[in-house]
């Protein structure tokens, strides 16, 4: 399909948008170690909390269990995400670096299945979690809501108190139904979380309406 981007190569920190990749590296470890698939019970519970509720403690536990930076960077390499990597100065998932186009590629591989980095069962499991994000975190790609539309998504937000005090506010996901089937990624920095959320909602709403209107069809 067609790809439209504005500043798609711009790099910033992932914040909680990294959590789908954290669950991915945990699933890869479980498979490599021949453990329960797609995840052992304890890690499955952590994955559910990390994705559906954006629970940071659960993401921390999965990050530690799955192998931290080396495992994350190996997944990014296997997915062909050339501008996605851990932060050399901070061994913390929130500070991993990525770009909108890399996240678009990740979502494309996750949804369409054209990757060997994750099995079909792993992809299905992760998309299932991303389709159950709690309501108050379905802004951005998931705005507006509709009972006839399915959204698999994850948002991320963090304030850079040690640098410029701006907020990184990100949203990635897949929207299908009601005549639509598209992937959308948004990354930006804003003076406040509310400003970033409102901007992502505006883009999510605009893309949803435009792609249902036929205006961009060739």
At which residue positions do the language-model features occur?
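Penicillin-recognizing serine hydrolase domain
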Residues: 64-218
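Short, hydrophobic alpha-helix immediately C-terminal to the catalytic nucleophile
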Residues: 23-27, 60, 104
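Mature, Sec-exported extracytoplasmic domains of Gram-positive
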Residues: 9-10, 24-30, 124, 147-148, ...
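A mature extracytoplasmic/lumenal domain signature
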Residues: 8-10, 16-18, 54, 66, ...
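Short, conserved catalytic-motif segment at the N-terminal edge
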Residues: 1-11
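Secreted/periplasmic proteins that engage bacterial cell-wall peptidoglycan
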Residues: 1-2, 16, 101
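Active-site SXXK
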Residues: 11-35, 50, 184
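Conserved catalytic neighborhood of penicillin-recognizing serine enzymes
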Residues: 31-82, 99-100
